[in-house]
Amino acid sequence: MVQSSLRFNGSVWCNLDIALRNLDQLFGRAIQPLGLTIIEWYILRALYERDGQHASELARAVGRAATSFTPNLDKLQQKGFIERRPDPTDRRAVHIYLTSLAEQHREEVLNSARLVDQQIRKMFSDEEFETFQSIVAYLQTLEPDYSENSSDYKNGQLGERRG
């Protein structure tokens, strides 16, 4: 494992942000041959897990605000990977479905994640990697408030833990 001091006086957020940006770069290079952006890749992964999600559900699944999510879906639709279908019970809502093109690329998309995960895993001992995964899993249980009027930060709360 690489030992180095943390930047910004050990600020968790700053250092985690830097680490995530570095991983984004690694992952971006891995998916570049697929012609996808990282957010498009996330959307496809979420749909491979459960096709036909409401657009708002899908936005939450990939950690985005529903209000700014539509352009991502537009681009994936233009590339031929998804299609929108109206919700029969709610005319304001749409379900997002994979196309046959997306199904043709399923293994490539899923394999790109496996390759990056394998590279990262090699950097750590098994015990360190298990600890890392536990921390990430815990951080994912925080319930963010994606509304524009959120007062969580002002009140000293970054989010509540789910489950």
Residue ranges, per PLM feature:
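N-terminal leader segment of winged-helix/HTH proteins
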Residues: 1-34
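C-terminal regulatory/oligomerization modules of transcriptional regulators
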Residues: 1-5, 126-163
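Long, contiguous secondary-structure blocks with strong helical propensity
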Residues: 5, 60-79, 131
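Active-site phosphate/pyrophosphate-handling residues
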Residues: 11, 42, 130
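N-terminal helix-turn-helix DNA-binding core of bacterial DNA-binding proteins
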Residues: 21-69, 151-153
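Charged, amphipathic alpha-helical coiled-coil/dimerization segments
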Residues: 24, 74-137, 141
